[in-house]
Amino acid sequence: MNIGYACINMQLSYPQKYGGKERGVKPITTGRSMIKRTFETKGVDYASEIALANAMDLDKIIDWNILNGYKFFRITSGLAPWKSEYEWKDLKDLKQIQMYLHSAGVKVDTHGVRITCHPGPFNVLTSPHEHVVENCVGDLTMHGETFDMMSLTRTPYNKINIHIGGAYGDKEKSMERFCKNFERLPDSVKTRLTVENDDKASMYSVKDLYHGVYERIGIPI
């Protein structure tokens, strides 16, 4: 049986509490971030430093996962803080970030570890509002670029999994918008995207997604 976990390695992130023999060592985490005021003050260079630290620790977490037999891992969506405000090419540490991401990707490929991600609920391709869709396309593109830097397969095996968003009073029209806006995504996202059903009756069931999304554009559920 293969097992895994999502995003936060409690033992490495909080060694004083959960670390056992790792007690006293520096936390290893991909959750470093900053508030907007800090970003506005310190700018993209500081974001680059945080992204590099997160990428370095992602590589270490992958090592730990392999050593401890974890074959599934959902990575954080926040490797680069405030990523909506800049491009990868703007980061002064990009080459090093790419190096650590590629290193992590080679390891998961060698050891058969499945990497996925689950972008946040603000990714709403069903939205009738253009600025919401634009932001969604940008955020999903960032995830696709991250997976490409890790050299992960462009297949649902390395899925970018999302809920499709609001129903806006008309599920059918909303799913039509989703399918239309799907075409705006780059191939790095299209080839990996999967959709997940909701647990509320007013939202999208597996049946809704099968007929309204999968049958139209073939996205796995």
What are these regions (language model features)?
Residues M1-R114, N123-V137, G144-L152, P156, ...:
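Alpha/beta catalytic barrel-like cores
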Residues N158-S174:
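Glycine-rich phosphate-binding "P-loop"
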Residues H118:
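Conserved, mostly hydrophobic/aromatic
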Residues M142, G169-R184, V195-Y204:
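Active-site glycine-rich loop that binds ribose-phosphate moieties when present
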